[in-house]
Each structure stands twice: as structure tokens, then as C-alpha cells.
Amino acid sequence: MMDSLPDAIVNYILSYNNNARDVAVCNCVSKRWKDSMPYIRSLYFPRSSFDNHTGQEHPDNIVWKMISSIVQLEELVVYTPFSGAGLALWLSHAGSSLRHLELRMDNLVENQTCIEGPLKLDCINAAKNLESLKLWGVLMTHPPRWDAFQKLWNLEIVGARMEDPALSAALRACPNLTNLLLLGCEGVISVSIDLPHLQQCKLDFYGLGNCSLSLTSPKIEILEVQGCSWIRVCESNCLKNLSIANNAGNHLIEVSDPDHSSLF
């Protein structure tokens, strides 16, 4: 059936194939299918992608070969382990076209970043046109070397060890966020969020529950906070849903907009 279709239609159909294993199989089916692979727009590497890998070639290089064969990759999701050097190489090719990037960083061990070359967080700076960035298992004790991601509207970080200056620097590099999600983050003591376009914000800080939060986002509609003892929300006429939780049992909330004081 596929063999009877015009090349343009075959390319279009196969461009929606995103699982790395399926892409590799397609390369072996026929030359025609292999020639369609450069038109793939999304590539996904599951956690188990290289569990049974016995070859001499490093998984980073295998990923690189697949990425470098694609003309304009828009989405890259990598759950399999990788190095900072590998990520830097991938993004040197695909960074300008990427719109969505999701990475399982696995760099919560502090000495790991000292031995593997480029810091993974710093490498992300090459993907300047990102619209969505999702990170898992992040060590952010130093400010990432990021320029501004002007097109980034969604930032999600799950499972992280952070320090206040590093988090503040990361948020400053994402001035146009509309959605911010920080879940399972340790080490944060005081955070100030000043994002004029932010509409949804979900924060979950691990620790003693004594973190302080100052939020200046006039368009905020949904705010969910866990682990803060002091919260200040500057004027907002858009707040619709609010959820505050603190296992320590103590929290103080200040809202500068008297119209929403009844929420508390």
C-alpha cells in the first residue's frame, strides 16, 4: 500500500513517526523509507532505548547520527542517559529549529557535572527558539548560562536541587512564560517571580516549609503552592484558582489586591 503512494505523501506519513526505535526500523525497510527520515519533526528516546545495546558505539553518537540526519527537528524528548558533550553536539545541529525540548537530566549528583565536560543546563542555551522546556532530575546550584528565551512560554522542572540565585537567573532568562511548573524542588529559601505574562504557576518546594515566595504576575489565573510559609502576591485581577499547602502547618499570605482578599 505504502509503495503505491507518491513520495510526498510517504514523507508526510512517516514524518509523524517519532519513537527512536521505530525510526531506526524504518531506515532498514527500504531506501524510499530511509529517504523520508530527514522529514521527521519529532524524536523520542525512551528510558530503555539502549538497555540492550552491546555495540562499541556510544549511545550519544547513535542519537547524534539520528538527529543530524533530520532537516528540521522541532521536538526532542530524551529520557535515556546522555552526557553534556553529547547534548552540546545534538543542539549544535538542531538547536535553531527546536520548539519543544524535554530531557531527563539525571545530574543530581554534584560531582557528575565536574567530570563530563559541558554542563547540561548551559548547553540548552543553543536552542534559542524553544517554546516549551521540560527538565527532570536537575542540579541547579549555579546560574545557568542562558541568554533570553524570548519564545519560551512553558517551563517545567521536576525533581531538582536548587539555590536561590540559580533559580532567579533561570527565570529571568524566560521573560515571556505563561506556564511555570516547579515540582519536588529542594534547597529554595526565597524566590521572587516577576513574570508579566504568567497565567499558571504550580510550585512544590521540599524542605522545612519555611520558603518565602513573592509573585508579581498581573495575569496570574491559577496559583498552586506547596512548602512556603510566607507568600506575597502582587496585584492581580485575573486570579481564579488558588491552592496553598504547607506540611509545617504555618503560612502567611499577603495579597495587594483587596478584591481577592476574601480568598484567604
Which ranges hold each PLM region?
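Leucine-rich repeat
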Residues: M2-H197, D204
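Acidic, glycine-rich loop-and-beta core segments that form the ion-binding/anion-interacting portion
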Residues: L208-F264
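Detector for repetitive beta-architecture
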Residues: S132, N154, S190, H197-Q200, ...
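Short, low-complexity, polar/charged sequence segments that are solvent-exposed and flexible
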Residues: L152-L155, C174-N176, Q199-K202, E221-L223, ...
